[in-house]
Amino acid sequence: MKYWDFRESGKPQYDYYAYTDGSYLVPKNFGAAACIVLDRDAERVLYQWSEASRYSTSHRQELAAIIHALLHVPERSSVLVRSDCESGIALLTGQVRSKKDGDLVDLYRQVKKDRELNVTLEWVRSHSGDRWNDYVDYLCIEALDLFESKGTRVREGVDSEALFAYICKQ
C-alpha cells in the first residue's frame, strides 16, 4: 500500500496533520463529512469525527470537514490539511470564488484567524492508496450507512457541537 510520507517527500514538518473528506448521495438527499487529526509524525490519530446530514452538497460537506478539523487542533499551531477536493482548496485559498459557499469560506477564515493557526492546504488524489485519505473516505461511507440504517448522525457519539456552536456564535 502506498501512502504519503512527509519524510520521503521533503515536506516541512507541521505540528499537526489533518485529512478531510466529504460525500453526498443525491438520490437520498443526505451526505457526510469526516476528518482526522494526526500527531506531528502523521502516524497516530489524535481525533476523528464523522457526521451525516441532510440538505447539503458534497462541496459543503468537504468544506465543513476542513473547518471541523481546524477546530480540533490547538490554537497557535501549524497544520497541514490534506483533502481530495481540489475545488474546495481553490475556494479556501482564494483561487476561485463562490457565492453559494461564501459563508463557509468566511467561517474558515474566521476560525483560522481566531485560533491563530498556520494552515497549509494540500490536495491528495482520492482512492490513490493514501492510507489516511482512504480512512476518512471510509468514515464518510460509514456515517452514510449509519444514518441510512439507524438514523445515527454522529459516529460513536463523538462531540460535533464545536462546529455548530462556532457557527451560531457568528
Residue ranges and their predicted role:
Residues 2-60, 64, 70-73, 166-169:
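RNase H-like nuclease fold core
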Residues 20-30, 66-139, 144-152, 156, ...:
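RNase H catalytic domain
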